[in-house]
From Swiss-Prot:
Heterodimer of two subunits, one of which binds GTP. It is found in: Cytoplasm. It comes from Trypanosoma brucei brucei. GO terms for molecular function: mRNA binding; translation release factor activity. Signal peptide: none annotated. This is Eukaryotic peptide chain release factor subunit 1. GO terms for cellular component: cytoplasm. Belongs to the eukaryotic release factor 1 family. Gene3D superfamilies: 3.30.1330.30, eRF1 domain 1 (3.30.960.10), eRF1 domain 2 (3.30.420.60). The gene is ERF1. Keywords: Cytoplasm, Protein biosynthesis. InterPro entries: eFR1_2_sf (IPR042226), eRF1_1_Pelota (IPR005140), eRF1_1_sf (IPR024049), eRF1_2 (IPR005141), eRF1_3 (IPR005142), Peptide_chain-rel_eRF1/aRF1 (IPR004403), Ribosomal_eL30-like_sf (IPR029064).
Length: 452
C-alpha cells in the first residue's frame, strides 16, 4: 500500500508501527561490527544489491577476528536469502536489517527483518556496523501534512510550503511602494490617494497569488497557513475581503519577522513551530470531544475500558476504535497442557501487574507452568483492527482531552455503529464463566471415588 492510498488515521497507525520498530532496532547491539543495514530506493534493482552483497562477502574473508568474520558473513548470507524472496522491489523500496544481536538478557539472537515502508525510501545504503541504522525510519515519522507560508511586507512577498522537514519556495516577487508624502499643499491628498491605491493593488496581487498557489479543485491543498511579515501588511491581508475566505479559515498563526524573503521565511517557520504541531492536536481534541459528547448525551453509542471495548469489538459493533498509543496493556495467549488431549487455549488482555496477580503462568494445581505468549495489546490492535470492521484512531495524552481519556476512561474506547446493551453482554459472559467453573468442579468431583 502506497502513502497516497492511506487515510490520515492509517498513516498514524503506520507511524506508530515504525516508532515501535525503531525502539526495538535501536535497543539491539551487534556482536562487533556485524549487523547490516540496507536501504533500497524504489528505482533500484535487486540484482545490483545482490552483486554488492556477494562482493562484500568476499571482502569479509579478510576480517582478522574469526568470530566477527563469521558473524558478518552470516548476516550477508541472511540478507541474500531474504532478497531472493522478492521478484521485484515493493513500490516504496525496501529496508533490510540482518545480524546477530545481544538481547536484554545478554543472549545472542539472530535477527532478519525486511520492511516494506509506507513512504518511498529516499536514499540507498549498505552499512555493516555494531548497531542498526534507523535514520530512514526516523524520516518516515516526519509529518506529511503540508503547511503554507506567506511572507509579506512593503518590499515584496514570498510564498512557500513546509512538509515535514522539506521546505519548498513556490514563488516570490518584489514591489516598490510609494512612501508617505511629507509635503503639504494641493498635491498631498493626491499622493495619499495614489499611495493607498498602490497598496490596495499590491494586496490584491498577494491575495490572488495565494489563491492560485494554495487552492486546488476549489479547496485548500494545505492543512494550515502562516502569515508573516515585518510590517502591518500581514494583518491587513488577513482582515481584507480580498483574501480568499477558504484560506482565511485555515490560518493557524500570524507572526512578526524582521526580514523579507528567504530569511524571513526561515524565521516564520521557527516562530510557527508550536502552531504547526498543534494542528494534529486540534484534530485529536475534536475526535475526543465527539466521544465525550456521546457519553454526555448517553446515546448508548459508546464504550470504554478494555473489557467492554473488546466485547463490542467482537460483536462487530465498533465503528471507530480510539486507543491511547502508549497504553500499558498486553495480550496473553495461555496454552494449558500443550500436546495433550485436554489442551486448552485462553486469551487474557491485562496489564503485567494484573497478570502477576492472576498468576496466569501457573495451572490451578500450582505445580505446572502454562505456555504463555505475550504481545503488546496496541501492537495487536494495529495489526488486527480491520478484522473487526472498524477504523482505528491512535491518540496521545498531550492535550487536556487526551489526558482525560487516559485517566478517566482507561485509554481505550469506541464509537458504536448501533446501540448495544453492554450490561447484558457482561451478564452473558459472567453466566458462561459460572457454567465453565461448575463444569470444571463437576469433573474434579467423582461421586463413586469419594463416596462408594
Amino acid at each position: 500500500m502506497t502513502d497516497h492510498e492511506l487515510s490520515e488515521s492509517e498513516k498514524a497507525i503506520e507511524r506508530y508501527k515504525v516508532k515501535k520498530l525503531i525502539q526495538m532496532l535501536e535497543s539491539a547491539r551487534g556482536m562487533g561490527t556485524s549487523v547490516i543495514s540496507i536501504y533500497m530506493t524504489p528505482k533500484e534493482q535487486i540484482s545490483g544489491m545482490v552483486t554488492k552483497l556477494n562482493n562484500e562477502y568476499g571482502t569479509a574473508s579478510n576480517i582478522k577476528s574469526h568470530t566477527n568474520k563469521l558473524s558478518v558473513q552470516s548476516a550477508i548470507t541472511a540478507s541474500l536469502g531474504r532478497l531472493k524472496q522478492y521478484n521485484r522491489l515493493p513500490p516504496n523500496g525496501l529496508l533490510l536489517y540482518c545480524g546477530t544481536v545481544l538481547t536484554a538478557e545478554n543472549k545472542e539472537k539472530k535477527l532478519t527483518l525486511d520492511i516494506e515502508p509506507f513512504k518511498p525510501v529516499s536514499r540507498s545504503l549498505y552499512l555493516c556496523d555494531n548497531k542498526f541504522h534507523t535514520e530512514e525510519l526516523h524520516r518516515m515519522l516526519e509529518s506529511d501534512e503540508k503547511f503554507g507560508f506567506i511572507v509579506v511586507d512593503g518590499s515584496g512577498t514570498t510564498y512557500a510550503t513546509l512538509c515535514g522537514s522539506v521546505k519548498e519556495k513556490l514563488s516570490s516577487f518584489t514591489v516598490e511602494l510609494p512612501k508617505k508624502h511629507g509635503r503639504g499643499g494641493q498635491s498631498k491628498n493626491r499622493f495619499a490617494r495614489i499611495r493607498m491605491e498602490r497598496r490596495h493593488n499590491y494586496l490584491r496581487k498577494v491575495a490572488e497569488g495565494a489563491t492560485q498557489l494554495f487552492i486546488t479543485n476549489d479547496r485548500p491543498n494545505i492543512v494550515g497557513l502562516v502569515l508573516a511579515g515585518s510590517a502591518e501588511f500581514k494583518e491587513v491581508l488577513y482582515q481584507s475581503d480580498l483574501f480568499d475566505p477558504r484560506l482565511k479559515a485555515i490560518v493557524v498563526k500570524v507572526v512578526d519577522v524582521a526580514h523579507p524573503g528567504d530569511v524571513g521565511l526561515n524565521q516564520a517557520i521557527d516562530l510557527a513551530a508550536d502552531a504547526l504541531s498543534g494542528v494534529k492536536l486540534v484534530q485529536e481534541k475534536k475526535l475526543l470531544q465527539g466521544f465525550f459528547d456521546q457519553i454526555a448525551c448517553d446515546t448508548q453509542l459508546y464504550c470504554f475500558g478494555v473489557q467492554d471495548t473488546l466485547k463490542c469489538l467482537e460483536a462487530g459493533a465498533v465503528e471507530t476504535l480510539i486507543v491511547y498509543e502508549d497504553l500499558n496493556i498486553y495480550r496473553y495467549t495461555v496454552v494449558k497442557n500443550r500436546g495433550a488431549d485436554d489442551e486448552e487455549t485462553f486469551v487474557h488482555v491485562m496489564s503485567e501487574e494484573e497478570a502477576k496477580r492472576s498468576n496466569i503462568h501457573m495451572q490451578e494445581s500450582g505445580k505446572t507452568r502454562n505456555e504463555i505468549e505475550q504481545e503488546d495489546f496496541v501492537d495487536w490492535l494495529a495489526t488486527n483492527y480491520r478484522k473487526f470492521g472498524c477504523a482505528l484512531e491512535l491518540i496521545t495524552n498531550r492535550s487536556q482531552e487526551g489526558t482525560q481519556f487516559v485517566r478517566g476512561f482507561g485509554g481505550i474506547g469506541g464509537v458504536l455503529r448501533y446501540k448495544l446493551d453492554i450490561i447484558a453482554l457482561r451478564d452473558v459472559e459472567k453466566k458462561e464463566d459460572d457454567e465453565e467453573r461448575i463444569a470444571a468442579n463437576n469433573e474434579e468431583f467423582d461421586f463413586d471415588d469419594d463416596f462408594m
